[in-house]
Amino acid sequence: MALWVTAVLALACLGGLATPGPVRRSTSPPVALRELIEELSNITQDQKTSLCNSSMVWSVDLTAGGFCAALESLTNISSCNAIHRTQRILNGLCNQKASDVASSPPDTKIEVAQFISKLLNYSKQLFRYGH
């Protein structure tokens, strides 16, 4: 009986040594990106009146400039409470200084509501397919 208990304990100890190493964490999309998607979804769903009094912003190429370009475009909108949280989230997602953002000069203006929808689609693609 003692030999049997010793064998079981030995196997248990050796089994612990043979277990695989630490399990890699799956790389989940950043929390800030999820927050941005939620915020943009809320903004686009709650449009009973015109967003930001139909203010216009520069249309930017989000695939080239990313969140920094979006933030730069929305910076000139100051009197619109609906997008303040979006601006704060974009500020956290933009990891470059404003002077480092190299983008072609914009030539087209679009309504803020259209820009927000465009930014929402871009963010969803990043969330699905990664950076």
Swiss-Prot record:
Any single Pfam family the record assigns to this protein: IL13
Biological process according to GO: cellular response to cytokine stimulus; cellular response to mechanical stimulus; immune response; inflammatory response; interleukin-13-mediated signaling pathway; macrophage activation; microglial cell activation; negative regulation of complement-dependent cytotoxicity
PROSITE patterns: INTERLEUKIN_4_13
Main location: secreted
SUPFAM superfamilies per record: 4-helical cytokines (SSF47266)
SMART domains: IL4_13
Glycan-bearing residues: 42, 53, 76, 121
Family statement: Belongs to the IL-4/IL-13 family.
Protein name per UniProt: Interleukin-13
Gene this protein is translated from: Il13
